């Protein structure tokens, strides 16, 4: 049996130069694995709590307390447990913390241990991680939702929408989808240069020009797709992450592109975009606690576009269950650090799929070289992954891992393509 023998932890840096937690787990059979924890810039209020140190060190963002929690409490609690019983290990972590939001020991400390244990168990079983988690039938390669133009909290510009993504839905394979996305990315750089706009990068590797607004950004990306010799819609669709909580104020409303709007007015705005651009997905179109607005928006345009819940669900099965009951969104964004353990993440995915919701695996803006989410996307058959632009090594690491997985699967590999958006892709053709 792959019994946990040692647990270690350290403070490392993420892609934004902020500290994060890295955990190492050794099993009694000699197997060793390591996991690093990501961190978000725009975070949902209901996410698992990151334990930060405060004070002057690293501007208060140090994670020595979380590291110490692993060394002093979490590690001793899981040593001796069977690593291939992930649910048992994760339940021990949840029980040890004892809070609903993992605020005592820190979601970052708990998640690091959870993921490192899963990796160690996979290695002990001599299985790739995607196969260990997903079983023998895992074979679907996800559509890369590439954030090639950054705004909102990911860029120092006046663009309110946080992410403008391209989705190569018409590609025959993941390797070709990645090529198409990279070529559009480079074409966009040329388009921006021609327009005299900045080609500086945002947090997730996308360009961060200060453009006039949403439609101006979508027009630039559409030009880039055509410049790359591809067809907007049929070959490469568009997607947005509005991260609307970032421009919502209680008592005021949505302060968006220079005007204050209601949820209904935001819905009208998105509906107008659907008529003008080949959009297949809109994430967080409204604020994280605007349940009634979300339900009305979903009823209005949910049959035309994928509506992804991130901040409103925070990968939490309880919040997702409420969303399903109330008709909120039709897809779940999956971020392992929002809920804090692999088991709870998989429970949320199962609930989403049983409820008829699609799932999109996601990185965070503060990333590391850890590639676990690439394996997770294939393991759960999500058909979609969001892990930034095809640039910056912490983003590209995930794409490169997916290339390896596709190669390892050989003839069994299937690229999700437009089947990842069965109700919506027809709108783009």
Swiss-Prot record:
Q: Which GO terms describe its cellular component?
A: cell surface; extracellular region; phosphopyruvate hydratase complex
Organism expressing this protein natively = Mycobacterium bovis (strain ATCC BAA-935 / AF2122/97)
Q: Which GO terms describe its biological process?
A: glycolytic process
The chain's coiled-coil residues are: none
Fetch the PANTHER family from UniProt.
ENOLASE
| Record key words, sorted | Cytoplasm, Glycolysis, Lyase, Magnesium, Metal-binding, Secreted
Give the main localization category: cytoplasm
Protein name as it appears in the record:
Enolase
Q: What is this protein's gene name? A: eno
Q: What is the lineage of its organism?
A: Bacteria, Bacillati, Actinomycetota, Actinomycetes, Mycobacteriales
Pathway terms, separated by semicolons:
Carbohydrate degradation; glycolysis; pyruvate from D-glyceraldehyde 3-phosphate: step 4/5
